[in-house]
């Protein structure tokens, strides 16, 4: 049995297997051919943090795969009253076939997976957002993008996930953050170790122009994530100059695409003009959450 907590847990071949499976299932969905890969199975969806795309994509995905999704907020569970994570994991995994968690702390996810009888999927944690990266890479493949990626902004869970994807698949990744907002040192070190095997190229700087120059893919994330509202004014000051605007985007490769995991805050991490110019790519990326996650779930089910 396998869990899907971080892309670092998988080989290049395994990641591509999931991507290829997602592409196959997406083609079937386009002609309304929904095969019951997960017939009569139940996915428990546990949300400590709210989300539009995560809930809708997993719930619709399970329905299209012949299964059922059960939504559970922290208020619906005894976790909110102090029940140990390990006990909740034991109970839920005895009744549900798979679990997806969107949590504040990655350690919560790891504890749940440790005591779960069935596969556990990371729907988002403070350290990683791997399902989003599966959608992003599926979008890159569909668009025929090159493999030079520029990530501009906060060295957060999205930056960490790009580090894992790039280092596993042998991509070139350039990350530009303000000083003091670099990716976690241990995660960066692991990515650099992976890169020695895969041939990936990883660069860090504090200069957005340097990162974007010649990039095939430009991506960013919100400067103020959920739970960081008290830091908003400070962050907005320190991220000045890191907005992906027309001038910055003009430095990328001629046919470069722009990706954003959403929600986007126009005028902050991305300008209105850049967002609207690349809206087709961004919303294709959002829809690919549905297809990429179906690929992940079916793959995990096959590995029991």
UniProtKB/Swiss-Prot annotation:
It is an enzyme of class 2 (transferase). Reversibly catalyzes the transfer of the carbamoyl group from carbamoyl phosphate (CP) to the N(epsilon) atom of ornithine (ORN) to produce L-citrulline. This is Ornithine carbamoyltransferase. GO terms for molecular function: amino acid binding; ornithine carbamoyltransferase activity. The keyword Cytoplasm applies. Belongs to the aspartate/ornithine carbamoyltransferase superfamily. OTCase family. Carbamoyl phosphate binds at residues 51-54, 78, 102, 129-132, 261-262, 289. GO terms for cellular component: cytoplasm. GO terms for biological process: arginine biosynthetic process via ornithine; arginine catabolic process to ornithine; citrulline biosynthetic process. L-ornithine binds at residues 157, 221, 225-226. It comes from Campylobacter curvus (strain 525.92). SUPFAM superfamilies: Aspartate/ornithine carbamoyltransferase (SSF53671). It catalyses: carbamoyl phosphate + L-ornithine = L-citrulline + phosphate + H(+). Pathway: Amino-acid degradation; L-arginine degradation via ADI pathway; carbamoyl phosphate from L-arginine: step 2/2. It is found in: Cytoplasm. NCBIfam families: orni_carb_tr (TIGR00658), PRK00779.1 (NF001986). Its EC number is 2.1.3.3. Transmembrane segments: none annotated. Pfam families: OTCace, OTCace_N. PANTHER family: ORNITHINE CARBAMOYLTRANSFERASE, MITOCHONDRIAL (PTHR45753), ORNITHINE TRANSCARBAMYLASE, MITOCHONDRIAL (PTHR45753:SF3). The gene is arcB. Keywords: Arginine metabolism, Cytoplasm, Transferase.
